[in-house]
């Protein structure tokens, strides 16, 4: 447990967590629900995201305009997000606004009014259309379905137009009743707010939530070596490469963070330097890590013109292979560790970051470590740890590749250039 953090479990099973920061004006508040797109049946894909939207349409105590006007008066934006495994609401308000802010957030989570379903469904359909016009985002959805085929964890978080268009109030109410239960909710706060006061406010605001049976998630089954191409009349081809990663409580996550930083996490990373700075082949290139309950995803993404595609992917394949072989450059492992530790401390200057870490870790059952312990774990990562993880996660034939662009022949040629150093049938 981190110093200064207190956690209380209410009779409903709801957990209240806080970190006292008396030296700031604002209190960061968040409500986290253990439900996301991974928990949806195929016919209602997108229901978690639509429900998140609908929470803003009003509750039994606060209509939509009252919610909007209150947070405008607070000088705050009430935000929400849906991921594959969680849904959250969050805001940052002054101390005097905490009671009303929590009352509104509690009412949204526990007693939504399910108003204006048709209108909000149209908003989400417009969001999906916008997303479909953004190929550098859309390519990750194509990759997800390659890596986790025919599984909820691989489907787009927001669903698709056909399933979202069929969602009605009955489906939304059923999803809320099944998943918005006390023991699936965490309320977190960071700032000048005493824990006992927060607990009392949450008990009043989130009343009506009761414990419910926990719904087990089927274990994800990752595929390997698959490819997909979507033809679009674009100037660039957008590429996403991905493979199966590790779960969010795996002790190797610290080594994976170092590996990700070395490969494509910053301005001195291999992908950025070799593909963009040295060769000028891309505007954007990066690696990424995503954690789920028992598994995860690792990968990289870039966009470039067809004539540059084979060279760019060939360089990426070479860098992945070199890391898996333990060919490190002078100082890069230590530099990556220094970066991670510095970013940890800089991020923790933010009450929003502290609140988010509390809520996210508790709702997903990740141990709450002190900043000192996290830094110690990062310091303990060795070159061998990074090499072994790279060799495992980027093993021959393990990676799936998705592309969106104008020229499938150029895509296939680039896959050949990528496969040559990496090996396998990616």
Which ranges hold each PLM region?
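Residues that act as N-cap/strand-start positions at coil-to-secondary-structure junctions
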Residues: 1-2, 224
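Active/ligand-binding-proximal structured segments within catalytic/core domains
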Residues: 13, 20-71, 251-263, 271-273
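A short helix-to-beta-strand connector/capping loop
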Residues: 14, 224-225
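Charge-rich, well-structured scaffold segments of protease-associated domains
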Residues: 5, 9, 17-20, 64-220, ...
